[in-house]
Amino acid sequence: MPKKLDLTDNLEKYIIDHSDDLTDVQKEILNYNLSLGDQKKLQISISQAQFLQTLIKTSNTKKVLEIGSFTGFSALSMALSLPDDGSLISLDKNVEFSKKAKSFYNKANENKITQIIKPALESLKELENAKQKFDLVFIDADK
């Protein structure tokens, strides 16, 4: 078996076809991101979002930290898969994108997401000082 599995178009189609359907709000985020031109590349793919959802559902994940949220597609996707007592903290420094993400979370009636809008290094220090622990950390920030 190869050490690496390439994500071909056929494999990605299979993943999408055999995963949960996107919600209307997830679709709205994707459509909105299309209007952002080159910045759309900051969004994870549908298959990546569905992989994260599967990972959360199968691993008893209750507490997620996301570093870098863009317009909220990944955070919303993960939050939708969390149990009722789950929570997600999303860190991003971009005020404009964070406001847009919040509007999508509100539209989806998703209350498991807490946003912290400031540089991630500052937020991470505060979370460490507060002795916060997470089951899953998704790093999708500017690299």
Label every PLM stretch briefly:
Residues 1-136, 143:
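A short alpha-helical cap/connector motif
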